[in-house]
Design a protein with these regions (language model features):
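Alpha-helical transmembrane segments and immediately membrane-proximal extracytoplasmic
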Residues: 1-408
Length: 408
């Protein structure tokens, strides 16, 4: 052994760790601030659209044409969104265009303003990944900045939802299913917690629900129902992922011109969104989530209609994420299943909220942690069991088609 050589190696490792920690801290602050702006504007837009749905929804086709023009005029590659992020994380792509950040924010705001059914979390993840990857390349971090890219994804997720534990594991497990990027754990944790604290300090509120009931896993009937629910939630997430991929392919083949695709198809989309209880299925789906956890009115078909409208909205070129609609789909389905089975509907809604998301994104630890961060740890074992079953039956499908699979 050479003590001086070992000491040099230790110093090099300490310097590298310090640079990652400092970078993650700075990126967490920046991404958390952007998340706060993006999230607060989106909430304002949601309230404004809800109050003026009759006036705004007829302009959905024109809004779609505007989104296509923005991407084609400024950076068409950026329209690939999460696919670019995944490819960069897997080393298949050298860079992510910085234009993605303003384009995806503007496109998502426009989509929601005029009534499209879409989410927001995927947008935040793209923002975090793009900014962190550009930072890593600018300062010549190793491995094409992959570690900081994962940290940025965690910051984007954690900053918008303020579920930092779940955000860390989502970023670590989503790029390559079945393989955890443990080398990114420390930077991802620092970036995620910093972004969460920053966005909260800037006025973005966390969604959380205190469940008053706890499921007993010692009761055979309850366990049987939970296994059945896990299967149904897993199949629902799988259905969403498969339909999203197939409908995108179909629309691209039938209407190759993006202007015609979004212009023509969004006309009947707007009509049906309006006929669906005056825009009940527009936007994020937070209205359905609120109904599920306040004991409000939910219909047996809410989950499937929200699923179909979201798939169609995203398949023709509108912008926005998938995660919040997945939460609303799962919560709506879980509430109905719980009511039918005689189990606490709100607890079952929470299980659906997490498990459908986990199935559709082909992740396991992230949805379990979301359940405990949003709804409390009291039903932690139930979240674990249901999310595990959903993960196992989803058939390795994922809404992010560029996700790599290391097993199955």
């Amino acid at each position: 052994m050479n003590p001086s050589h070992d000491l040099q190696g230790l110093k090099k490792k300490a310097k590298e760790t310090f640079l990652y920690v400092l970078s993650a801290l700075l990126l967490g602050i920046a991404i958390g601030a952007i998340d706060a702006v993006f999230g607060r504007v989106l909430l304002f837009i949601t309230d404004f659209r809800s109050a003026h749905i009759v006036v705004l929804l007829p302009f959905l086709p024109l809004a779609g044409l505007g989104i296509v023009w923005l991407y084609r005029h400024f950076n068409e590659t950026a329209a690939k969104g999460m696919t670019i992020v995944m490819e960069a994380g897997q080393g298949k792509r050298e860079s992510i265009p910085l234009a993605l950040i303003p384009l995806v924010m503007a496109g998502t705001w426009i989509t929601h303003l005029f009534g499209g059914s879409a989410g927001r979390e995927g947008v935040a993840v793209q923002i975090g990944a793009t900014l962190s990857h550009a930072f890593a390349r600018r300062f010549h971090f190793p491995d094409n900045g992959r570690i900081l890219l994962i940290a940025g994804m965690a910051a984007g997720f954690g900053g918008l939802f303020q579920t930092p534990f779940a955000a860390v594991f989502f970023a670590m497990e989503v790029v390559v299913s079945g393989s955890m990027a443990y080398s990114a754990l420390l930077p991802a944790a620092i970036a995620s917690f910093t972004a969460s604290a920053t966005s909260h300090a800037l006025g973005l509120e966390k969604f959380s629900v205190l469940l008053s009931q706890t499921l007993s896993l010692t009761d055979t009937k309850t366990v049987t129902y939970l296994i059945l629910f896990g299967i149904l939630f897993g199949l629902t997430g799988r259905l969403f992922a498969v339909l999203l991929q197939k409908v995108k392919q179909f629309m691209g083949n039938v209407l190759e011109n993006p202007y015609k695709r979004i212009g023509f198809v969004s006309i009947p989309l707007a009509v049906f969104l309006f006929l669906g209880w005056n825009g009940r299925y527009c936007g994020l789906g937070t209205n359905l989530i609120a109904q599920a956890f306040s004991g409000g009115e939910l219909y047996m078909f809410d989950w499937i209609l929200k699923l179909l409208f979201t798939v169609l909205t995203l398949s023709i070129g509108f912008q926005g994420g998938e995660v919040t609609p997945l939460f609303s789909i799962g919560a709506s389905l879980g509430f109905v299943l719980g009511s039918l089975a005689g189990l606490p509907p709100m607890v079952c809604a929470a299980l659906g909220y997490t498990a459908v998301f986990g199935s559709a994104t082909n992740t396991f630890l992230a949805p379990v942690l979301i359940g405990m961060e949003v709804f409390g740890v009291e039903n932690g074992l139930a979240f674990f069991a249901v999310c595990l079953v959903a993960f196992l039956v989803n058939g390795n499908r994922c809404i992010y088609t560029a996700q790599k699979r290391s097993f199955w």
